[in-house]
């Protein structure tokens, strides 16, 4: 086998020692790719050179064109979420889209040259991330063909936010004539969730910053509240004395979520995507507490893509950044609530 470089870090970039690399059909043997990694939980993200991954049995090698950024990526890198098993250096990123560059033995689901997208949370965590130029994953992962009419940047943006918005709302149906309060409505998941809730017949109250208010109103919400100018609780109680039927909270910590859940009527439901809902405590006031976890499937990806192409759903605005901008963007993202969707163009 040939000797090529492995990673060692200085000045935010990679340097090298030697290690073996197998040749990959469709990819030059010995090729080095760039990726964003952390060396340990809580370490600063850096751009590194890594050996190109190989497509093992049952795997596809994807030459990524774009990767969607998610709050989960910051949570993982910081160590706030520590799934097991994990490996370091940990390649970050879950959502991506690109071209099938190589096929491992027995990987018959896709063909070379196919445009595919999906959510690639692979065990051990960190062994395959989308903040990289290439990724090798099992062909049975939540992947789907990118339909004609949807570009790869747009496809990379939607796996987590579109899948979450669709399946979260469907888990709460029927929602017809229900009042749904969405906290963090201007972000990616919020943009999809409020649109699917409106389609389901809900009256949506969207907590959103002024900069995104016009866009969110265009989705058909009944009311918007900017919590930087007026208190959400006071505003909601004034218009809904008996409480709202459903709370969907995409951003709050445990303390803030518990306070907002007091706005839900007895018999209603309070959902957290940050896993901070205390179901036992909420049940004491007659509220069902739910910690939502996305279980992505290829079918969900196909449905979201079709809804986008049919104009049934409108994607949030995309901000494009380069791989080199990711470390600083992640640091800023840990301090600020984002609006729309950020995508790394590779």
Label each residue range with its predicted role:
Residues 4-7, 11-33, 301-346:
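C-terminal hydrophobic helical "lid"/dimerization subdomain
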Residues 101, 205-207, 271:
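Conserved beta-strand positions in the Rossmann-like core of class I SAM-dependent methyltransferases
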Residues 253-313, 346:
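Glycine-rich phosphate-binding loop and adjacent beta-alpha segment
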Residues 231-242:
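Short amphipathic alpha-helix with an adjacent loop that forms part of the alpha/beta core around
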């Amino acid at each position: 086998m040939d000797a090529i470089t492995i990673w060692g870090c200085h000045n935010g970039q990679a340097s090298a020692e030697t290690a073996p690399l197998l040749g990959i059909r469709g990819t030059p043997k010995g090729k080095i790719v760039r990726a964003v990694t952390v060396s340990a939980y809580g370490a600063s993200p850096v751009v590194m050179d890594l050996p190109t991954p190989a497509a093992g049995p049952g795997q596809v090698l994807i030459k990524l064109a774009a990767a969607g950024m998610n709050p989960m990526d910051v949570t993982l890198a910081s160590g706030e979420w520590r799934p097991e098993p994990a490996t370091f250096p940990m390649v970050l990123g879950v959502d991506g889209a690109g071209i099938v560059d190589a096929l491992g033995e027995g990987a018959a689901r896709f063909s070379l040259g196919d445009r595919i997208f999906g959510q690639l949370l692979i065990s051990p965590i960190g062994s395959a991330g989308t903040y990289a130029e290439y990724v090798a994953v099992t062909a049975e992962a939540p992947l789907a063909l990118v339909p004609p009419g949807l570009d790869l940047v747009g496809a990379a943006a939607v796996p987590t936010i579109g899948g979450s918005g669709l399946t979260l709302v469907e888990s709460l149906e029927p929602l017809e004539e229900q009042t749904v309060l969405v906290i963090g409505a201007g972000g990616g998941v919020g943009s999809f969730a409020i649109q699917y809730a409106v389609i389901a017949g809900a009256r949506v109250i969207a907590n959103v910053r002024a900069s995104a208010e016009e866009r969110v109103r265009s989705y058909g919400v009944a009311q918007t509240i900017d919590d930087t100018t007026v208190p959400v609780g006071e505003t909601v109680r004034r218009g809904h004395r008996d409480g709202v039927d459903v709370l969907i909270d995409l951003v709050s910590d445990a303390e803030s979520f518990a306070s907002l859940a007091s706005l839900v009527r007895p018999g209603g439901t309070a959902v957290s995507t940050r896993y901070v809902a205390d179901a036992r405590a909420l049940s004491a006031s007659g509220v069902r507490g739910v910690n939502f976890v996305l279980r992505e499937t290829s079918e969900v990806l196909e449905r979201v893509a079709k809804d986008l192409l049919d104009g049934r759903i409108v994607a949030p605005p995309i901000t494009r950044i380069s791989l080199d901008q990711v470390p600083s963007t992640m640091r800023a993202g840990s301090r600020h609530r984002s609006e729309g969707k950020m995508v790394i163009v590779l």
